[in-house]
Amino acid sequence: MRDRASRPGREGARGCAIGRAARRFAAERRGTSGIEFALIAPILLLLLLGGTTVFTLVRDSRTAERATYTVSDLLSRSTTKPDLNASHALFLAITRHAAADVRFRVTSVKKVKDKMVIDWSRAQAPEAPLADLAPLSAKLPVVADGDSILLVETSLTSRPLFSYLGLTDQTFAYLSANRPRFVPALPAPD
């Protein structure tokens, strides 16, 4: 006589029906591309928006760096009083940012008796003229006694295209130090 567990009954038939339904479901291919698209599309969109945002931030950083070195080189070639308004306007034109997002300062520094001394410093609002060289001392190049250098400091605040991805405003700050090429020191601008 068979015992109860080995007898085919309702539980065995139900298990067999569930197995057949599971096999039919696994073999079914209709609608899978729609489900795959629904799962992958948000990820692709996030990658596209994130890539575009990161590219824009890197482009802004590189442009600000190039603009800083361009303005610094232009000022170092000057033989007369520099026009800082024109230099600031050139920086804004190269970076294509609003003046509110940009800080701009030009400082002439001389080395007198083994000490760096500020000759003059001018800045565009809201930046203030440089009063103390101590924060920049580690970034200054080696200068011969009696020589001068021209420091151009800029910073640019860039806003991400899609800030809801967790990125916040980025500030890119650059310092360029050049020796005046044709004169010992640039005269102070008006």
Kindly give the residue locations of the regions a language model identified.
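Short, conserved structural patches
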Residues: 2-4, 69, 73-190
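Alpha-helical assembly-interface signal, strongest on the long, hydrophobic N-terminal helix that forms
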Residues: 2-92
